[in-house]
Each structure stands twice: as C-alpha cells, then as structure tokens.
C-alpha cells in the first residue's frame, strides 16, 4: 500500500516512532498491507461512511480504510506513542482522520457522530476485545449507532461469536451475538502476519445488527444464558435452578424440553425462556 498511498512501509514507521508492541496493551501489529486492505474491503463499500477504529497502532488498517474510500475515520488510540504516526496519516488525508487519545473501554464515540450511524472496523487489542464487543452488543436503543462491525479476534473467540447450537464453541457470547446480529466468519490470518507473532491464529468476523431482533429483555436473556451455560453439561431442569424459579416449569412454558442441555438450545429458545422468566417473576410480584 505504500505505493498506493505514498506513505512509508509500516516497519519503517514503527522503527522511527519507537512503536515496539506492548503486551500490556494487547498489541499485535498487522504489517501485511494486503491483509489490511482485505479487511477494509470486507467492511465496504466505504464511500460516505464514517468508520470507528479501535487501537490503530501504527496505522496499517487506518491507511487501508482511507485508501478504500472511507469518508472519515475516527481512530481511538490509548497508546500516546502511536499519535505521531497517526498524525502523519492525517496530514496525508486532510480532514478525513480524527485521532482520539483515549481508552476505548471508557470512550463513547457517539457524540462525534452527530446522530449519524458509523461502522466499526478494528484489529482489536486481544485483552479488551470481548468486553468491547459485549458493550457494543448491549447498546441501547436498538438498532444501535453502528450499521456493521468487522472485527479481528483470536480464532477461539471468533468461533464463540458465530457458533450455533450443537457447536462446541456455542455459549453465552454466541447467544447474545446472534440474537442481536447476523454473524459470519470471513477469513483467518496466520500468526506470521503480526509483529510480535501471537501464538494463535486470528479471524475476521462480520456482525450486522438485526433491525428487529426477537422481542426480549436483554438482562433476562443474559441471566438465562449465564445460568444454563454455567453448568452446560447438566440438563436445564438442573442448571436453571440458579434463576430462583422452577426450572422445569420455565423451560416447559417456553416450549423447551427441560431434559435438554444448554448447548442444544437455539437462540430462539433462550429468547423464549427469557420472556417466560419475566412473566414468572411478574406473576410472583403481583399481589
């Protein structure tokens, strides 16, 4: 991409700005600009789109997003060492890159969007990837402030996001992700593409918010999933006792056989049980 955007190779940028990746920040820099371009294309078309990027580091994906045509990129970077490299990209793309030095776990980008929707595209720092995703999936109101997420995770986490019932990776994260979004695994990236090399393969995932998920109380859904998968090898009539209601009654009222295990219940089944949980609690609280 250096030949396309006229900016120096990423290895030179890292050396010049003393940007050795820090394990404490979950940093693994993706230096293959062909792969960053592939991620940007997977999030496209980006014309007239505002992209929110988390943890841009030396800016490989940032450059790809801008070169692919993103109207505006809001890059949220906690590591002050990376700001100089990002400012060079901003100078190359005047008015299109906004750099925010902040912790993505604490920063809310919505005030910068002026009421418009954005697209989240990021090689997420490994140590905060799952909490960030859960926060975005729990956004209120719904549909959320973003129209798509294209994100890189450790492959094991990516599998937990896109899993369906009867998959080994199916669990609480899959229930929440697939209740609110259409999810899909796009492609893998080998450890050799990163500096430093992680010990595991990474995967790029796309999540597109559903405009109208099945009606459900999110907190109740999370409670049911947590109870069921907290003892995933046990039958629902046992694992759901943690909810403080008759587990067999709860499952049966939702049309689910209480002898089933959590890993065999589809997302729609968890939604039904969450709705029944609300009804049972409301009935108990009615004088």
UniProtKB/Swiss-Prot annotation:
Entry GO CC: cytosol
Molecular functions (GO terms): 16S rRNA (adenine(1518)-N(6)/adenine(1519)-N(6))-dimethyltransferase activity; RNA binding
Organism: Rhodopseudomonas palustris (strain HaA2)
InterPro entries (alphabetical): KsgA/Erm, rRNA_Ade_diMease-like_C, rRNA_Ade_Mease_Trfase_CS, rRNA_Ade_methylase_Trfase_N, rRNA_adenine_dimethylase, SAM-dependent_MTases_sf
Binding annotation for S-adenosyl-L-methionine: 28, 30, 55, 77, 103, 123
Subcellular location: Cytoplasm
Classification via Pfam families: RrnaAD
Identification of the protein by name: Ribosomal RNA small subunit methyltransferase A
Gene symbol of the encoding locus: rsmA
Membrane-spanning intervals of the chain: none
